[in-house]
């Protein structure tokens, strides 16, 4: 696949725009769950397949961190995924996450973003 060797942090704006179109196609054509809200299942499945490109998304940490209401998250469809993905990409442009890579919890830059969100939530609950 064209997505296999891509890293979120390395994408140029043009590459990002192309990737988001490919991901939208996958979002709309992979039937991974019968639930109305596919964002969690989709992001976690794609993170497993494309760990350097996709940040895993969940309700408890990611939805809360971005302060999305349940209806926004539940019914926003691909727009919600695009919102998260765009914010994650922008974050990689602002911070050097490579410096935080290790062999334990921070195995890739997308997992570092996930860990930052979880850590923020745990510190502030």
Whereabouts are the PLM-identified features?
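Helix N-terminus capping/helix-initiation residues
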Residues: 7-10, 44, 108, 114
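Helix-hairpin-helix/helix-loop-helix acidic hairpins
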Residues: 1-37
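C-terminal accessory module of base-excision DNA glycosylases/AP lyases that mediates lesion recognition
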Residues: 57-125
């Amino acid at each position: 696949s064209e997505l296999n060797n891509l890293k979120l942090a390395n994408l140029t704006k043009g590459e990002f725009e192309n990737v988001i179109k490919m991901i939208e196609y996958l979002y709309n054509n992979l039937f991974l769950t019968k639930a109305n809200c596919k964002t969690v299942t989709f992001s976690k499945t794609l993170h497993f397949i494309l760990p350097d490109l996709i940040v895993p998304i969940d309700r408890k940490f990611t939805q809360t961190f971005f302060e999305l209401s349940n209806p926004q998250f539940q019914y926003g469809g691909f727009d919600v995924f695009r919102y998260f993905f765009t914010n994650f990409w922008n974050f990689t442009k602002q911070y050097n996450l490579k410096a935080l890579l290790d062999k334990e919890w921070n195995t890739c830059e997308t997992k570092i973003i996930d860990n930052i969100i979880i850590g923020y939530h745990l510190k502030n609950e």
